[in-house]
């Protein structure tokens, strides 16, 4: 196994899978960042702040636990779903997921994923916005989907890469950003930090 090249400040199995798909060796660093939208923030500002907060929290945590200053970059990311200027994050319970999926049903929405790569010296953030269209969903489909367990840890209460993919009629943008990590943009940023 090759040497670790960067840290991932995320517990998301999908982000771990996608970073592995890019061929990077990484270590996970667990960070605790409060995800609370400020009234003055746009959706774009909010998701970018969260990815920056996660990456910089990772940098601080690594520096606090290592004897030498960490030189490896830390990658933080966050994904939100936006419909009618309403931000949809992870559902709290079935009623919340039902509300979200009913909002998305038969309509277009946006998935915003922000990725930040940071070190002590610098940071870079990139936002990728993808338009997604849903078919009209029945209450039975929503309930059955919730019972699958899939929507419970996903922004907007669905996963494009799983059962939720059957609700999607069209997509414009990055499929991988909807999953949680845009591959092209992430790869360019990481290569830039690693001088590859």
UniProtKB/Swiss-Prot annotation:
Keywords: Cytoplasm, Hydrolase, Nucleotide metabolism. The active site is at residue 78. It catalyses: dTTP + H2O = dTMP + diphosphate + H(+); UTP + H2O = UMP + diphosphate + H(+). GO terms for biological process: nucleotide metabolic process. The record marks 14, 79, 161 as: Important for substrate specificity. It is found in: Cytoplasm. The keyword Secreted does not apply. GO terms for molecular function: dTTP diphosphatase activity; UTP diphosphatase activity. Its main location: cytoplasm. It is an enzyme of class 3 (hydrolase). HAMAP family: Maf. Nucleoside triphosphate pyrophosphatase that hydrolyzes dTTP and UTP. May have a dual role in cell division arrest and in preventing the incorporation of modified nucleotides into cellular nucleic acids. This is dTTP/UTP pyrophosphatase.
């Amino acid at each position: 196994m090759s040497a670790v090249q960067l840290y991932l400040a995320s517990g998301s199995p999908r982000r771990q899978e996608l970073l592995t798909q890019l061929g990077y060796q990484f270590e996970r660093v667990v960070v605790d960042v409060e995800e609370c939208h400020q009234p003055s923030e746009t959706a774009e500002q909010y998701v970018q702040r969260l990815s920056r907060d996660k990456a910089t929290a990772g940098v601080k945590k690594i520096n606090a636990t290592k004897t030498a200053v960490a030189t490896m970059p830390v990658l933080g990311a966050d994904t939100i779903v936006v419909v009618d200027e309403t931000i949809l994050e992870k559902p709290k319970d079935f009623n919340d997921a039902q509300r979200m999926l009913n909002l998305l049903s038969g309509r277009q929405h946006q998935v915003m994923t922000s990725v930040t790569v940071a070190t002590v010296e610098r940071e870079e953030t990139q936002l990728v916005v993808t338009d997604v269209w849903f078919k009209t969903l029945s209450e039975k489909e929503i309930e059955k989907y919730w019972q699958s367990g899939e929507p419970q840890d996903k922004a907007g209460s669905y996963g494009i890469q799983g059962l939720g993919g059957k609700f999607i009629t069209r997509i414009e943008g990055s499929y991988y950003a909807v999953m949680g990590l845009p591959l092209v943009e992430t790869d360019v940023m990481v290569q830039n930090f690693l001088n590859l």
